[in-house]
Amino acid sequence: MDDEEVAESWEEAADSGEMERRLEEKLRISQKERLSSGSSSRSPMRTAIVIQDDSLPAAPPPQIRILKRPSSNGSLGSSALQTRPSPQVKSLAQREAEYAEARKRILGSATPDDTPQERPNSDRSPRGSSHTLSEENRPGNHVVRQPAGPDGTQGFHHQRR
């Protein structure tokens, strides 16, 4: 084996016929061993010898097939499309009606005019005016308690100097 010439690449060995020559030599050697072991009755038990050579090409790798998805005629695709609702383009009036319905369900009022953020500032008294009872008793004012200051007076309605 030391006197064998080793090719630089398997492509060069295949082109020059070196691989075929080595394969034929190994087959001849294995046939001679079979004949010699078959004629001699010394070894009653025969053993199989598997010769693997790195210079021989290995078995081809398993092929991977990339399959396409079935068209819309497939049973899986059509059932998935039937269960999913189709997106509908709604008009502005439909969207506003749904919004008002959801708002009424959640907040209890259908119009956004009832919110304190959107009230005009004219309902509120000017900053420097005195505190009146009518402001506390207004129907829109839902104050549970008025905070008291450190000296027992009403804290937020006390005028600063």
Curated annotation (Swiss-Prot):
| Disulfide linkage | none
Alphabetical keyword list: Phosphoprotein
Q: Per the record, which residues fall in region Disordered?
A: 1-161
Q: What region holds the SUZ-C domain?
A: 116-160
- Extract the PROSITE patterns matched here: SUZ (PS51673), SUZ_C (PS51938)
Q: Where is the SUZ domain?
A: 42-111
Give residue spans, biased composition: Polar residues.
Answer: 70-91
- Looking at the UniProt entry, the stretches that span the membrane are none
Q: Which PANTHER family match?
A: SUZ DOMAIN-CONTAINING PROTEIN 1
Family to which the UniProt record says this protein belongs: Belongs to the SZRD1 family.
Q: What is this protein called?
A: SUZ RNA-binding domain-containing
The gene behind this protein is: szrd1
